[in-house]
Every structure is written in structure tokens, then in C-alpha cells.
Design a protein with these regions (language model features):
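Hydrophobic residues on conserved beta-strands that form the core of alpha/beta folds
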Residues: 57, 70, 86, 105, ...
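Gram-negative outer-membrane beta-barrel proteins
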Residues: 114-118, 162-167, 209, 276-280, ...
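Tryptophan-anchored aromatic micro-motifs
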Residues: 151-159, 474, 535, 575, ...
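Transmembrane beta-strand segments that form the barrel wall of outer-membrane beta-barrel proteins
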Residues: 203-206, 230-236, 308-316, 393-401, ...
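Amphipathic hydrophobic-ligand
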Residues: 79-93, 168-187, 211-222, 228-229, ...
Length: 726
């Protein structure tokens, strides 16, 4: 019996020894990569049959509780379309606490792979749904809200990721969120933690090129997502053309379901640090601005929901000099434009007009054309400019604006627009536009006009055809510089433009000019002007309108022009109660009249007055008339200054006559040494091409200094080479 027990004991010992050896061999065999690969291939072959889809793993290396290393992982969907093709996957494990619903991973590396995600055109089903269906539990599982995953490091290198919703059409330009393709995708992230629906991570590097052409050089940020929303901190986004810093971007929610109603429920709380943004990068996400490719520099705070988004303390720079500081409240763009409410404020701005003209606009949009007359402003410096209301009823005000033309301020005005046109008027019944040191002459290219200071109010309407109507225009001009004189206290009243007719009143109460006038001007191409002026007093020398000293003028003037064009026009002027005083002499005329007629090259001018009558008729060639006459008079009187020997003849061919009436006071003022009897007559003709000037003089009496002549009869004809007469 003892022997039997010894034999049995020995046999059991030998069996245990071999069993231990077998266990040791088995353990080492399982840890061998080729064994693990063989097992994996058998498992994937079985899985392929179960899924009716190709699943392959090229090589496996697993160390229990240490790491999992997979190579050449490939998965197809049942339609034989690739879902995953991965060259290398490495998973470094740290702790796996099944009972505590916690998984801690040291490292996850994905290298050289392609991931294809699609949604079916028929029902929107994802192409990986067959995997979810196979591995899902038959009965509802316990909530995973307490499951926690910690991943110390995630690296993705040289990856390709695509997403296509086959139910949606593809956009021709820009990032299409229904058809995404990320090439050369590289990602490095640390401190990744998920618990339930929450996620936190530190993005160290994110790079890719999207199929649209948008290229991301790098993105760094601290990110978190939960039921309370999405939060990015200390984000830095870089593209080849843009560098954007976002210290804070929070999309706040009460529930993750709020993202399904993004415009109304998700609240923005963001700060954009001073950043360089290339508009071409923005165009990939807003195709409407495609073609805009310049850099802008901006910073600011973004608040509230998208339906009432506020951009506070916005700083915007573009071009060489333009800078804008503003507070903006964007409207709800989902509403019809008539119900979109604007409330915008430019606190400070320097706008360079050349920067505006050089701005690249979206494709198909004409470049900004700055009107020639406005280009003279060069720039605008604005302070506290405000705009509020709807597109059809806007209120605009500008506390202060300065340009190369001068300064202006604009009290609140109302701009109403409808299908029939636009109407602009002041909110209050008072002047709303003030101009200071305004270079009116520079604006109008009239060098004789200088600065203007004044205040204006008006109501302006522009209909759909571009017709302009001005109502109730009034202005109080503190000063207007004209012809080297600064006129003060000018008033414009009851001015209007209607049916292309301008009607208005002008009143001047300057120390050297007191007058009132009524104007009626046709703004069309055909001249039609009517002007009535009552000049109570005008100190002409002080106004730089006369070289004499202390001369004064007064009259009631009626002036008009009428005709289909300036080449066929009739004009008249009447001066009643004309008084002109210089030194101790005065001229008075109860009525003086001038009639003017022009038809093509033919002109006729008639002047009649108690002082003298004058008539000229024919082809005048006004632009060269003076030089023409001086040339011919120099033949008879060579000392005439300005005469030239070489001369090009004009078309001038006219007759003229002058008859004196009561000229004594006129001569006392301008030629005090000359006396000319009444009924003195000067008449003649001039033909430039024939080089012929005829002058005839009939004078009862003429006295000059100590000389005195009576019964004078004089006739002279001047040719190009001689003069004769009697």
C-alpha cells in the first residue's frame, strides 16, 4: 500500500511538473506576436462572416495590461466600401477598473490611415451602423453616464478623414459640412477625459487640408464639452495667411439638445484677441464673400445668442490706414429684412477713401467707385456715429466727422425706404447738418470760393428712377469765403427741388452786403434760369469787387436765361433804381436793361440805360476776342501792350455801336479828366479773317485835360498792313 501511494505520488508530481511546463509554454506562446496574429486572423475571419463585411488585421502584439499594437487594420461595410484602413494602431494601457467603470490609457497612436464615414442617400444610415448593430447588447444596458475614460495622449499622424452625406448636394465652393475631406490630418492631444457625455482635452496640435482648399497649419486650445456647452480657452489658430487668437470661446447651453436650436438657445461668450484674418480663409465658410482675399486685423467681444448677436469693443483695421472701433448688434437674419432691427455704433474711426476703393469685393461685385467730387475728402475721421432701426426706417447720427474738406456733424436724421424710393429728413424741426471750415471751393473746383461754416436742414426724396426732390431746405451760414472776402450772416430759406426745378430764397446781412434774392433754376440740360435780387447796399471795394475805394452799389435786379441749349438761348437783365457811388460822385438809373440772344455762333447784345446805349451783333468768338482786337489795334497804335506779331485769326465778324446819354457822373468816377457830350456815337465793325477793323466817331463836344474839341467826325479802317480814314 505504501508502495502504491509512493507510485501515485510520484506520478502526480510528474504530471504537475509537466502541467506547469505546459502552462509556461502556453503563456509564452500566447504572448508571441505570431500566435496573437494567427488568433486575430481567425477571429477577423469569423467576424467577417458574421458581419458579411471584410475585416482584416495584418499583425497583432498584445501585452496584457500593458499595450495593444495592431497593424494593417482594414474594415469594409457590407457594400464593400472601405470604412477604415489603418497602417498602425498603438494603445498603451495603464489601468482598467471594470468594476469602477474606469479606463485609463497612457497613449493612443493612429498612423497612416483613412477613415471614411458616409450616410446613405436613401435613409441617412451611417456606413458603420452594421458594427453598432452587431456589438450592441440584446437588452438595454446600464447607463454609461458614470463610465470614465482618461487618455493621457492621443496622436494621429498622416491620416485621412472623410464624411459624406449622400442625401445632400455638393457645394461648388467653400467648406461643405455635408461633404468633408481632411487630408494630411495630424492631431496631438493630451489630458483627454470623458465621463458620461462630457469631454475635456488639451489640443497641442491640429493640422489638415480640407477638400475646399482651406488649410489649417495649427490649432492649439484647451477644450471641454458638457451639457453646459462648449468651451475653448487660450486657442491659437494659424493658417498660411491668418493668425487668430481666441483667449475664450464659450457656447453656453442648458442642455446639449440646445445645439439643435442653435440660433435661439446657444449663447456666445467669446473674446477675440488682436488677430490677423485673411478674408479668403473666411470665404471658405462664407462663400458669399468669395473674391475677398485681403488681410484685416480685428479684435473684440462676442455676446448673446446668434439671433441678437452683439460684437462689443470691435477694433478693425484694413488697408494702409483705415481703423474702426465699434459696438455692433446684428439683426436676426432669419427674419424678413423689413423686420431686422439694427443698433450699431462707431465710437471712433479713421476711414481712408483709397483703402475703400482698393478693397477687393466678392466676385461679380463691381469695385467701390468713390465719386470724383468725394475723393477730395481723402479720409473721414468719425466719432460716435450711430445707426438704429430697420432697413426701411433708419435713424443715423454723427457726433463729429472730419476730412480734408472740413468738419461736419449730423444730428439724428431719418432715412425711410420703400419701393417708390428713399426719403431723408431730420428728426427734430431744426438744423441737423453742421459744416465747419468746409472747403466748398475745393469741392466744386472753384478757386474763388473758400471755406464755409453753417448749419442746414432739409427733406430729400429720391424715387426709383433716380429723380430727386428737395423740400423745405433751410440754412444759416455763419460765413462763406468768396473772392478773398469772408461773407457773414447768410440765410437760405424755402428752398426746394421738384420736377427738376430748384426754387429758393437767399438773404445776406453782411456788414458790406445787404441783399435778398429769389432763384428759380432748371436743373436739366436746357438752360432756364430766373433770378430776382434786391441789393440794398453793397460796398464793392470791401467785397474785392472794385479797385476804387469806398464805392457803393444798390439796385433791384431781374435776370433770366431761357433756351433749348447754351448755343440757342435768350437772356435778359433789368436793373431798377440802380445807384452807384464813389467818392463824391453818384450814378443813378431808374431802369437799365440788357437783352442777349445767341444762336449757334451768332450773338446779339443790347444795353439801354439813361447813361448810355450799347449794341453788338454778329460772331464774337468770345474766348479770343480781346486778343484779336489788341492785335489789330496795335497796327495803328504799336505801343499797345500785349500785342503780338504772329496771330491766328478767329471767326469774329460783328458790328457794334455805342450812344452816350448822361455820362458825366460815370466819367467823373472812372475818367475824371474826360468830358463827353450827350449823343456821342461810336460805331463800327470787325472781321478777323479779313483783318479789317472799322471805327466811326460822331461827337458834339469832347474835352480832355486842357484840350477841347467840338463837332468831331472820325472814320478809321484798319487793315493788316495799313490804316486809312478821315
Amino acid at each position: 500500500m505504501t508502495k502504491v501511494l509512493k507510485i501515485a505520488g510520484l506520478t502526480l508530481a510528474i504530471l504537475l511538473e509537466w502541467l506547469l511546463v505546459l502552462v509556461i509554454v502556453l503563456v509564452f506562446a500566447i504572448r508571441s506576436s505570431w500566435v496573437q496574429t494567427y488568433i486575430a486572423k481567425r477571429a477577423t475571419s469569423y467576424l467577417s462572416q458574421e458581419l458579411n463585411a471584410k475585416v482584416e488585421i495584418g499583425a497583432v502584439d498584445i501585452v496584457l495590461f500593458s499595450h495593444i499594437d495592431l497593424k494593417d487594420v482594414y474594415i469594409e461595410d457590407p457594400e464593400k466600401h472601405p470604412v477604415l484602413a489603418l497602417k498602425h494602431l498603438y494603445l498603451g494601457l495603464d489601468k482598467f477598473k471594470l468594476l469602477q467603470n474606469k479606463l485609463i490609457v497612457n497613449e493612443l497612436r493612429l498612423y497612416g490611415g483613412k477613415i471614411h464615414i458616409e450616410r446613405a442617400a436613401k435613409d441617412g444610415r451611417y456606413n458603420f451602423a452594421f458594427l453598432e448593430d452587431y456589438f450592441s447588447a440584446d437588452s438595454p444596458s446600464k447607463s454609461s453616464s458614470d463610465f470614465e475614460l482618461k487618455l493621457a495622449r492621443l496622436d494621429m499622424e498622416r491620416m485621412y478623414l472623410s464624411y459624406h452625406d449622400l442625401r445632400k448636394d455638393t457645394l461648388n465652393y467653400g467648406v461643405d459640412f455635408d461633404h468633408l475631406e481632411f487630408k494630411k490630418l495630424n492631431l496631438s492631444a493630451t489630458h483627454i477625459q470623458t465621463k458620461g457625455d462630457g469631454l475635456k482635452c488639451q489640443i497641442r496640435k491640429l493640422q489638415f487640408i480640407e477638400r475646399s482648399g482651406f488649410e489649417l497649419d495649427n490649432l492649439k486650445a484647451t477644450a471641454s464639452f458638457s451639457e453646459k456647452g462648449l468651451l475653448l480657452r487660450n486657442a491659437l489658430l494659424q493658417t498660411p495667411k491668418s493668425t487668430i487668437g481666441i483667449p475664450k470661446l464659450a457656447l453656453l447651453t442648458n442642455s446639449s439638445l440646445d445645439f439643435n436650436d442653435f440660433d435661439d438657445r446657444v449663447v456666445f461668450d467669446a473674446f477675440l484677441a488682436p488677430s490677423k484674418v485673411n478674408l479668403q480663409d473666411i470665404s471658405y465658410f462664407a462663400p458669399e464673400i468669395r473674391g475677398m482675399d485681403q488681410n484685416v486685423y480685428l479684435s473684440g467681444f462676442v455676446k448673446e445668442r446668434l439671433r441678437e448677436l452683439q460684437i462689443q469693443n470691435l477694433h478693425l483695421r484694413f488697408g494702409k490706414a483705415t481703423k474702426i472701433q465699434a459696438n455692433l448688434r446684428l439683426p436676426d437674419f432669419r427674419k424678413p429684412s423689413s423686420r431686422q432691427f439694427l443698433q450699431e455704433q462707431i465710437t471712433k474711426a479713421h476711414i481712408d477713401l483709397k483703402d475703400l476703393a482698393d478693397l477687393h469685393l466678392p466676385l461679380g461685385t463691381p469695385a467701390i467707385q468713390i465719386p470724383t467730387i468725394l475723393q477730395k475728402a481723402n479720409y473721414f475721421d468719425l466719432k460716435n456715429a450711430q445707426l438704429s432701426g430697420t432697413y426701411s426706417n433708419l435713424q443715423v447720427s454723427i457726433a463729429e466727422a472730419q476730412s480734408a474738406l472740413g468738419e461736419l456733424s449730423l444730428a439724428p436724421i431719418e432715412i425711410k425706404s420703400a419701393n417708390h424710393g428713399i426719403n431723408i429728413s431730420g428728426i427734430a424741426d431744426s438744423n441737423f447738418l453742421e459744416l465747419a471750415h468746409f472747403q466748398l471751393g475745393h469741392l466744386l473746383d472753384i478757386p474763388e470760393i473758400g471755406q464755409l461754416n453753417g448749419a442746414f436742414q432739409f427733406e430729400l426724396s429720391i424715387d426709383a428712377e433716380g429723380e430727386l426732390q428737395l423740400k423745405d431746405a433751410n440754412a444759416q451760414l455763419a460765413s462763406l469765403f468768396v473772392n478773398q472776402y469772408n461773407y457773414t450772416n447768410l440765410k437760405i430759406e424755402e428752398t426746394q427741388i421738384q420736377d427738376n426745378q430748384l426754387v429758393g430764397k437767399l438773404e445776406v446781412k453782411d456788414p458790406n452786403l445787404v441783399m435778398s434774392s429769389v432763384l428759380q433754376l432748371d436743373l436739366g440740360t436746357a438752360p432756364s434760369y430766373q433770378i430776382q435780387a434786391d441789393i440794398t447796399s453793397a460796398a464793392l471795394s470791401n467785397l474785392h469787387l472794385s479797385s476804387l475805394g469806398n464805392d457803393e452799389f444798390s439796385a433791384r435786379i431781374n435776370l433770366g436765361f431761357e433756351g433749348p441749349s447754351w448755343d440757342a438761348v435768350v437772356g435778359f437783365a433789368s436793373l431798377r433804381d440802380l445807384r452807384y457811388k464813389a467818392a463824391d460822385h453818384a450814378i443813378y438809373s431808374e431802369l437799365a436793361q440788357i437783352h442777349y440772344r445767341k444762336n449757334e455762333s451768332y450773338s446779339k447784345i443790347d444795353l439801354s440805360s439813361p447813361v448810355l446805349d450799347f449794341n453788338i451783333e454778329g460772331v464774337l468768338s468770345e474766348q479770343s476776342l480781346l486778343q484779336d482786337l489788341k492785335h489789330h489795334l496795335a497796327i495803328l497804335y504799336p505801343p499797345i501792350e500785349g500785342a503780338v506779331n504772329e496771330f491766328s485769326h478767329s471767326d469774329a465778324d460783328f458790328e457794334f455801336s455805342l450812344l452816350t446819354r448822361n455820362t458825366q457822373e460815370l466819367l467823373n468816377i472812372f475818367l475824371p479828366e474826360l468830358e463827353l457830350a450827350a449823343s456821342t456815337k461810336i460805331e463800327g465793325s470787325f472781321d478777323s479773317k479779313q483783318e479789317q477793323l472799322k471805327i466811326g466817331l460822331t461827337c458834339p463836344r469832347l474835352a480832355y485835360q486842357q484840350f477841347e474839341l467840338e463837332a468831331i467826325q472820325f472814320d478809321q479802317t484798319i487793315f493788316h498792313d495799313k490804316a486809312n480814314g478821315e
